[in-house]
Protein backbone atom coordinates (compact mmCIF):
# COMPACT_ATOMS: atom_id res chain seq x y z
CA UNK A 1 0.00 0.00 0.00
CA UNK A 2 1.27 3.46 -0.87
CA UNK A 3 2.35 5.77 1.92
CA UNK A 4 -0.19 8.47 1.05
CA UNK A 5 -3.01 5.97 1.65
CA UNK A 6 -1.81 4.76 5.02
CA UNK A 7 -3.59 5.94 8.16
CA UNK A 8 -2.34 5.98 11.72
CA UNK A 9 -4.33 4.75 14.71
CA UNK A 10 -6.16 8.08 14.95
CA UNK A 11 -7.50 7.59 11.43
CA UNK A 12 -5.44 10.48 10.06
CA UNK A 13 -3.64 9.84 6.79
CA UNK A 14 0.13 9.70 7.08
CA UNK A 15 0.31 12.02 4.07
CA UNK A 16 -1.70 14.66 5.94
CA UNK A 17 0.76 14.53 8.83
CA UNK A 18 3.66 14.97 6.41
CA UNK A 19 1.91 17.98 4.87
CA UNK A 20 1.32 19.50 8.30
CA UNK A 21 4.94 18.99 9.35
CA UNK A 22 6.30 20.50 6.14
CA UNK A 23 3.87 23.41 6.37
CA UNK A 24 4.86 24.08 9.97
CA UNK A 25 8.50 24.40 8.91
CA UNK A 26 7.74 26.53 5.86
CA UNK A 27 5.49 28.96 7.76
CA UNK A 28 7.99 29.55 10.56
CA UNK A 29 9.92 32.82 10.67
CA UNK A 30 12.91 32.59 8.28
CA UNK A 31 15.69 32.87 10.84
CA UNK A 32 19.19 31.34 10.73
CA UNK A 33 17.64 27.86 10.85
CA UNK A 34 15.79 28.30 7.56
CA UNK A 35 18.26 26.33 5.42
CA UNK A 36 18.08 23.36 7.77
CA UNK A 37 14.29 23.49 7.80
CA UNK A 38 14.18 23.60 4.00
CA UNK A 39 16.43 20.53 3.87
CA UNK A 40 14.00 18.73 6.18
CA UNK A 41 11.07 19.83 4.01
CA UNK A 42 12.82 18.41 0.94
CA UNK A 43 13.09 15.04 2.69
CA UNK A 44 9.43 15.15 3.69
CA UNK A 45 8.30 16.04 0.18
CA UNK A 46 9.92 12.87 -1.08
CA UNK A 47 7.01 11.09 0.60
CA UNK A 48 4.20 13.53 -0.27
CA UNK A 49 2.28 12.60 -3.41
CA UNK A 50 0.13 14.65 -5.76
CA UNK A 51 -0.81 18.35 -5.68
CA UNK A 52 0.12 18.80 -2.02
CA UNK A 53 3.76 18.10 -2.76
CA UNK A 54 3.73 20.57 -5.64
CA UNK A 55 2.12 23.29 -3.52
CA UNK A 56 4.60 22.89 -0.69
CA UNK A 57 7.43 22.69 -3.20
CA UNK A 58 6.50 26.11 -4.62
CA UNK A 59 6.95 27.74 -1.22
CA UNK A 60 10.18 25.86 -0.51
CA UNK A 61 11.67 26.86 -3.86
CA UNK A 62 10.71 30.51 -3.37
CA UNK A 63 12.32 30.61 0.08
CA UNK A 64 15.52 28.97 -1.18
CA UNK A 65 15.79 31.56 -3.93
CA UNK A 66 15.59 34.54 -1.56
CA UNK A 67 18.33 36.24 0.37
CA UNK A 68 17.86 35.73 4.15
CA UNK A 69 17.25 39.40 4.86
CA UNK A 70 14.74 39.73 2.03
CA UNK A 71 12.92 36.60 3.22
CA UNK A 72 12.69 37.96 6.77
CA UNK A 73 11.43 41.36 5.61
CA UNK A 74 8.82 39.77 3.36
CA UNK A 75 7.65 37.55 6.23
CA UNK A 76 7.12 40.52 8.53
CA UNK A 77 5.38 42.52 5.81
CA UNK A 78 3.14 39.57 5.03
CA UNK A 79 2.14 38.25 8.43
CA UNK A 80 2.73 41.13 10.85
CA UNK A 81 1.56 44.13 8.85
CA UNK A 82 -1.53 42.68 7.18
CA UNK A 83 -4.46 41.95 9.45
CA UNK A 84 -6.04 39.48 7.01
CA UNK A 85 -2.82 37.44 6.93
CA UNK A 86 -2.46 36.78 10.64
CA UNK A 87 -1.58 33.20 11.60
CA UNK A 88 -3.14 33.53 15.06
CA UNK A 89 -6.28 31.48 14.45
CA UNK A 90 -8.38 32.78 17.35
CA UNK A 91 -7.90 36.36 16.18
CA UNK A 92 -10.49 35.66 13.49
CA UNK A 93 -12.96 33.86 15.73
CA UNK A 94 -12.73 36.14 18.76
CA UNK A 95 -10.73 39.22 17.77
CA UNK A 96 -9.28 41.23 20.66
CA UNK A 97 -12.14 40.30 22.98
CA UNK A 98 -12.40 38.53 26.31
CA UNK A 99 -13.52 35.42 24.46
CA UNK A 100 -10.12 35.11 22.83
CA UNK A 101 -8.41 34.14 26.07
CA UNK A 102 -10.90 31.31 26.50
CA UNK A 103 -10.41 30.17 22.93
CA UNK A 104 -6.63 30.15 23.28
CA UNK A 105 -7.07 28.14 26.47
CA UNK A 106 -8.83 25.46 24.40
CA UNK A 107 -5.62 25.04 22.37
CA UNK A 108 -3.47 24.88 25.50
CA UNK A 109 -5.85 22.33 27.03
CA UNK A 110 -5.63 20.15 23.91
CA UNK A 111 -1.84 20.18 24.20
CA UNK A 112 -1.91 19.25 27.89
CA UNK A 113 -4.42 16.45 27.30
CA UNK A 114 -2.06 15.05 24.65
CA UNK A 115 0.76 15.01 27.21
CA UNK A 116 2.77 18.06 26.13
CA UNK A 117 3.05 21.49 27.77
CA UNK A 118 1.57 24.59 26.15
CA UNK A 119 3.92 26.63 23.98
CA UNK A 120 6.79 28.50 25.57
CA UNK A 121 7.82 30.79 22.75
CA UNK A 122 4.55 31.43 20.95
CA UNK A 123 0.78 31.64 21.43
CA UNK A 124 -0.96 28.24 21.36
CA UNK A 125 -3.19 29.24 18.42
CA UNK A 126 -0.25 30.21 16.17
CA UNK A 127 -0.67 28.16 12.99
CA UNK A 128 2.88 26.71 12.73
CA UNK A 129 2.55 25.55 16.35
CA UNK A 130 -0.83 23.91 15.71
CA UNK A 131 0.53 22.20 12.59
CA UNK A 132 3.55 20.87 14.47
CA UNK A 133 1.27 19.52 17.20
CA UNK A 134 -1.01 17.86 14.64
CA UNK A 135 1.92 16.33 12.77
CA UNK A 136 4.03 15.06 15.64
CA UNK A 137 1.98 14.80 18.85
CA UNK A 138 -1.74 14.06 18.44
CA UNK A 139 -2.97 13.95 14.82
CA UNK A 140 -6.60 13.44 15.83
CA UNK A 141 -6.72 16.38 18.21
CA UNK A 142 -4.67 18.46 15.81
CA UNK A 143 -7.06 17.81 12.94
CA UNK A 144 -9.99 18.81 15.16
CA UNK A 145 -8.33 22.11 16.03
CA UNK A 146 -7.54 22.84 12.38
CA UNK A 147 -11.01 21.82 11.19
CA UNK A 148 -12.68 23.96 13.86
CA UNK A 149 -10.73 26.93 12.47
CA UNK A 150 -11.33 26.24 8.80
CA UNK A 151 -12.80 29.71 8.32
CA UNK A 152 -9.68 31.56 9.56
CA UNK A 153 -7.55 29.28 7.39
CA UNK A 154 -9.63 30.14 4.34
CA UNK A 155 -9.35 33.85 5.11
CA UNK A 156 -5.58 33.47 5.42
CA UNK A 157 -5.35 31.44 2.21
CA UNK A 158 -7.34 34.04 0.31
CA UNK A 159 -5.32 36.95 1.68
CA UNK A 160 -2.03 35.32 0.75
CA UNK A 161 -3.28 34.40 -2.71
CA UNK A 162 -4.53 37.95 -3.33
CA UNK A 163 -1.10 39.28 -2.32
CA UNK A 164 0.73 36.82 -4.58
CA UNK A 165 2.61 35.52 -1.54
CA UNK A 166 4.86 32.46 -1.87
CA UNK A 167 3.28 31.22 1.36
CA UNK A 168 -0.17 30.91 -0.26
CA UNK A 169 0.47 27.43 -1.76
CA UNK A 170 1.47 26.07 1.65
CA UNK A 171 -1.73 27.24 3.34
CA UNK A 172 -3.68 25.86 0.37
CA UNK A 173 -1.99 22.48 0.94
CA UNK A 174 -3.06 22.56 4.59
CA UNK A 175 -6.66 23.43 3.67
CA UNK A 176 -6.70 20.49 1.24
CA UNK A 177 -6.09 18.08 4.13
CA UNK A 178 -9.30 19.20 5.87
CA UNK A 179 -12.98 18.55 5.12
CA UNK A 180 -14.32 20.69 2.30
CA UNK A 181 -15.67 24.00 3.58
CA UNK A 182 -19.44 24.21 3.78
CA UNK A 183 -21.38 27.01 2.08
CA UNK A 184 -21.92 28.59 5.48
CA UNK A 185 -18.18 28.48 6.24
CA UNK A 186 -17.40 29.99 2.85
CA UNK A 187 -19.83 32.86 3.46
CA UNK A 188 -18.42 33.46 6.92
CA UNK A 189 -14.86 33.52 5.57
CA UNK A 190 -15.89 36.05 2.94
CA UNK A 191 -17.60 38.21 5.56
CA UNK A 192 -14.61 38.13 7.92
CA UNK A 193 -12.25 39.02 5.09
CA UNK A 194 -14.35 42.11 4.39
CA UNK A 195 -15.20 43.42 7.85
CA UNK A 196 -12.60 41.81 10.11
CA UNK A 197 -12.92 40.00 13.46
CA UNK A 198 -14.99 40.93 16.53
CA UNK A 199 -13.68 44.02 18.32
CA UNK A 200 -13.39 44.68 22.04
CA UNK A 201 -9.92 45.81 23.04
CA UNK A 202 -8.76 44.17 26.25
CA UNK A 203 -5.40 43.20 27.64
CA UNK A 204 -4.42 39.63 26.87
CA UNK A 205 -1.52 37.65 28.29
CA UNK A 206 -0.37 35.46 25.40
CA UNK A 207 0.76 31.91 25.98
CA UNK A 208 4.31 31.57 25.21
CA UNK A 209 6.31 25.45 21.17
CA UNK A 210 9.29 24.87 19.32
CA UNK A 211 8.85 26.84 16.09
CA UNK A 212 11.04 29.95 16.14
CA UNK A 213 9.31 32.65 18.23
CA UNK A 214 9.12 36.13 16.78
CA UNK A 215 7.35 38.31 19.25
CA UNK A 216 5.24 38.29 22.38
CA UNK A 217 2.05 39.85 21.04
CA UNK A 218 -0.82 37.58 20.08
CA UNK A 219 -2.27 39.91 17.45
CA UNK A 220 -0.95 41.47 14.25
CA UNK A 221 -0.47 45.13 13.62
CA UNK A 222 -3.38 46.80 11.87
Name each model-derived stretch.
Residues 1-127, 131-222:
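Charged, alpha-helix-forming regions
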Amino acid sequence: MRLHRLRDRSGVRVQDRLVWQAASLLLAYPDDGLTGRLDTVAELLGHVAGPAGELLGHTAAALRAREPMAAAMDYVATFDLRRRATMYLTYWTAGDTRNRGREMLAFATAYREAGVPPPIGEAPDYLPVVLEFAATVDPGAGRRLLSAHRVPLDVLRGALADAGSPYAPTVAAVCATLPVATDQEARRADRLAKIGPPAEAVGLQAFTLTVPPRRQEGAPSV
